[in-house]
C-alpha cells in the first residue's frame, strides 16, 4: 500500500507563512526602490532641462551684447573714416590754394601733367563728392542701428516691482458692511456727558419723537441706510452726507484755568447739495461747532433738525 500523505506541521506552516511575508516585503521594497529611482531620474532630467534653458538664455544675452558691441564699433569706425577723409580733403584744398594761380603756370602744369594723373585726380574728386553726399545716410543708419539695439535690450529687461503704498490697506480698514466710509473719527473723539437731542420739524410741525444723540461719539447722516445712523431719505441728500462728531476740546474756565469739555461738531462729507446751519451753507471737510438751538438742514430737504439737550430752557 502507498504511504498516506501527512499534513504539514504548525511549525512548518508558520515558517512558510513567514517566508512568504518576507518575499512580499522584498518585492514591495524593490517596487519602492524602483519608484524612488524613477523620481530621482525625473528630477535630474528636469534640472538638466532647466540648466539647458538657462544656458540658452545666457547665450542669447551674450549674443545680443556682442551684436550691440559690434554695431557700436562699426559706427565708431565709420565716424573715424569720415573724419580722416575730411582732414585729407582740407589738406588737399589748402595745398591747391597755396600754389600759384597765374594762367601761364596753370597752362604749363596742365601741359606737363600726364593723362594718368588727370584721370586719377578726376576719379578722386568724384569719389570725394559721392562720399560727401553719402555721409548723412551712413550716420543715420548707424544711429538707427544703435537705437534698435537699445530698444531690444530695454524690452528684455523685466519690469521692476513697485513697493510704493497703494492705499488699499487703509481703504479696507475703513470699511463697514462692505462700504468704504468717507469719515474717520479723530483721536479726540469722546462720548458726551450731556444728553443731546435732535428735534425734527417739517413745515413748522414736529415729526415723531426726538432723536437721542448721547449714546455714541459720532452719528452719520445720509441716504445709505446700511451705514447711516440717522437716514435722510430725501433725493437731494448724498449717501454719506454729513456727520455729527463729539470732540474733547480745551476751554477756558471762569477762573481763568484751562479745562477740557466734550462739544458737538458737524462736518459736511463733500455732499452734492451741501449742509446748512441756521440757513447758512458750511464748507465740506471742515468741523463746525454746534450750539444749543442751532437748526440743521441737509440738501434741499424741508426737514429741520433743532439741537437741544436735557437742560435746555423750554
From Swiss-Prot:
Report the record's Gene Ontology biological process terms.
Answer: cell division; miRNA processing; regulation of developmental growth
Residues of the FHA domain: 219-282
* Outcome (variant: residue 238 to A): Loss of interaction with DCL1
Where in the cell does this protein reside? Nucleus
Comp. bias (Low complexity): 1-10
Keyword tags: Nucleus, Phosphoprotein, RNA-binding, RNA-mediated gene silencing
Tissues in which the UniProt entry reports expression: Expressed in roots, lateral roots, vascular strands of roots and leaves, vegetative meristems, pollen and developing seeds.
- SUPFAM superfamilies according to UniProt: SMAD/FHA domain (SSF49879)
Q: Is the RNA-binding keyword given for this protein?
A: yes
Specify residue ranges for compositional bias: Basic and acidic residues. Answer: 18-127
Mutant phenotype after disruption:
Delayed growth and reduced fertility. Defective roots, shoots and flowers. Reduced seed set. Reduced levels of primary miRNAs as well as mature miRNAs.
* Source superkingdom: Eukaryota
Protein's recorded name = FHA domain-containing protein DDL
Amino acid at each position: 500500500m502507498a504511504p498516506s500523505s501527512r499534513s504539514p506541521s504548525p511549525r512548518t506552516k508558520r515558517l512558510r507563512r513567514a517566508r512568504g511575508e518576507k518575499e512580499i516585503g522584498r518585492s514591495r521594497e524593490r517596487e519602492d526602490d524602483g519608484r524612488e529611482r524613477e523620481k530621482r531620474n525625473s528630477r535630474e532630467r528636469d534640472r538638466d532641462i532647466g540648466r539647458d534653458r538657462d544656458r540658452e538664455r545666457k547665450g542669447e544675452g551674450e549674443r545680443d551684447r556682442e551684436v550691440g558691441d559690434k554695431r557700436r564699433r562699426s559706427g565708431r569706425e565709420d565716424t573715424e573714416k569720415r573724419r580722416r577723409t575730411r582732414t585729407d580733403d582740407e589738406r588737399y584744398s589748402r595745398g591747391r590754394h597755396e600754389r600759384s594761380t597765374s594762367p601761364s603756370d596753370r597752362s604749363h602744369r596742365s601741359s606737363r601733367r600726364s593723362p594718368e594723373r588727370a584721370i586719377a585726380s578726376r576719379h578722386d574728386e568724384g569719389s570725394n563728392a559721392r562720399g560727401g553726399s553719402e555721409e548723412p545716410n551712413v550716420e543715420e543708419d548707424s544711429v538707427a542701428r544703435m537705437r534698435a539695439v537699445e530698444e531690444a535690450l530695454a524690452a528684455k529687461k523685466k519690469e521692476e516691482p513697485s513697493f510704493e503704498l497703494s492705499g488699499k490697506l487703509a481703504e479696507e480698514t475703513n470699511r463697514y458692511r462692505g462700504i468704504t466710509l468717507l469719515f474717520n473719527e479723530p483721536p479726540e473723539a469722546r462720548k458726551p456727558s450731556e444728553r443731546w437731542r435732535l428735534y425734527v420739524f417739517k413745515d413748522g410741525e414736529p415729526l415723531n419723537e426726538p432723536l437721542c444723540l448721547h449714546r455714541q461719539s459720532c452719528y452719520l447722516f445720509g441716504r445709505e441706510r446700511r451705514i447711516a445712523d440717522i437716514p435722510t431719505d430725501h433725493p437731494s441728500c448724498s449717501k454719506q452726507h454729513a456727520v455729527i462728531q463729539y470732540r474733547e476740546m480745551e476751554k477756558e474756565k471762569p477762573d481763568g484755568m484751562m479745562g477740557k469739555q466734550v462739544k458737538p461738531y458737524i462736518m459736511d462729507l463733500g455732499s452734492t447739495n451741501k449742509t446748512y446751519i441756521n440757513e447758512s451753507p458750511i464748507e465740506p471737510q471742515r468741523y463746525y461747532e454746534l450750539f444749543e438751538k442751532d437748526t440743521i438742514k441737509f440738501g434741499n430737504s424741508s426737514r429741520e433738525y433743532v439741537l437741544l439737550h436735557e437742560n435746555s430752557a423750554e
